[in-house]
């Protein structure tokens, strides 16, 4: 009997779950699923470090509030940490079914219930877009001037998703759409007018028409700042920018962001 009792009370061997810590996203810890993309996710904390820290400041100070659109969500390296830092919904939008499945599975493992994946490409209207790239990480613009790539996907606008009640109450839009930024904003007029969200967007300053998208934001009464941060693994001219609606913006906010991250990186355009 004593041997039986002894065997029943032995501690079980616990297999530790691999994890990623996003130190620059308020130290969010994510358990990783058994998938090749999990290693990419684990490394993302050290990419776009200043951008991540700026977003953390904006979330902690409730400048980013309500729901978030993460467009070009890829493997959820922004969507998932943000979902753990806000009470609202993160709409993770990406054209790749594999990326959306990876995000969903990672969220399930971590009991994250406020991420909604939407498998679409986004542009200024409803149409078929094509790419020569794998959908997992692609551009519908670069290297495809005639829209005749072998991979085809359904594209819609953010205004279409809003009208169809797929998205609502938007406080922040993040765009990483490889050359489609202008068209995405062009197709978001109703969303912008209804919610006046903060917008971040990535551009290649030497090959994208940065002045064109600046003019579009100014037309909507936004103030744009470039984040002067070199992005590892990207072209040397790749930069993120932040567009603040004029009613949200003030000089003190910019000073507070610089104080929080410890350096001056925001350049008004």
Locate predicted features:
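Internal alpha/beta domain cores that form substrate/cofactor-binding pockets in large enzymes
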Residues: 158-163, 168-201, 206-261
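S-adenosyl-L-methionine
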Residues: 1-162, 165-167, ...
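Hydrophobic packing residues within well-ordered alpha-helices of enzyme cores
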Residues: 82, 103, 131, 184-188, ...
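Active-site flanking residues adjacent to catalytic metal/cofactor-binding acidic residues
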Residues: 69-71, 93, 120, 173-175, ...
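Short internal loop-to-helix segment that lines adenine-nucleotide cofactor pockets
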Residues: 39-69, 116, 142-195, 206-207, ...
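Short, glycine/acidic-enriched loop or turn micro-motifs at the edges of active sites
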Residues: 73-75, 97, 122-124, 177-179, ...
């Amino acid at each position: 009997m004593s041997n039986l009792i002894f065997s029943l009370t032995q501690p079980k061997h616990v297999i530790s779950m691999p994890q990623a810590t996003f130190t620059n996203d308020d130290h969010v810890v994510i358990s990783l699923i058994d998938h090749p993309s999990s290693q990419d996710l684990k490394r993302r904390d050290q990419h776009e470090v200043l951008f991540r820290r700026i977003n953390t400041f904006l979330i902690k100070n409730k400048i980013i509030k309500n729901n978030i659109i993460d467009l070009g969500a890829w493997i959820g390296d922004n969507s998932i940490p943000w979902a753990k830092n806000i009470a609202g919904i993160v709409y993770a939008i990406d054209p790749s079914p594999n990326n959306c499945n990876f995000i969903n599975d990672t969220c399930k493992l971590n009991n994250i219930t406020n991420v909604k994946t939407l498998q679409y490409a986004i542009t200024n209207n409803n149409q078929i877009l094509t790419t020569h790239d794998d959908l997992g990480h692609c551009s519908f613009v670069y290297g495809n001037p005639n829209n005749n790539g072998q991979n085809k996907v359904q594209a819609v606008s953010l205004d279409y998703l809003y009208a169809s009640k797929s998205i609502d109450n938007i406080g922040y839009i993040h765009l990483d759409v490889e050359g489609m930024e202008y068209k995405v904003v062009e197709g978001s007029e109703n969303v912008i007018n209804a919610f006046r969200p903060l917008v971040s967007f990535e551009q290649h300053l030497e090959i994208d028409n940065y002045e064109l998208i600046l003019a579009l934001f100014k037309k909507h009464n936004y103030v744009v700042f470039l984040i002067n941060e070199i992005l590892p693994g990207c072209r040397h001219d790749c930069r993120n920018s932040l567009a603040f609606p004029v009613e949200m913006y003030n000089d003190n906010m910019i000073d507070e962001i610089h104080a929080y991250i410890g350096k001056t990186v925001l350049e008004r355009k």
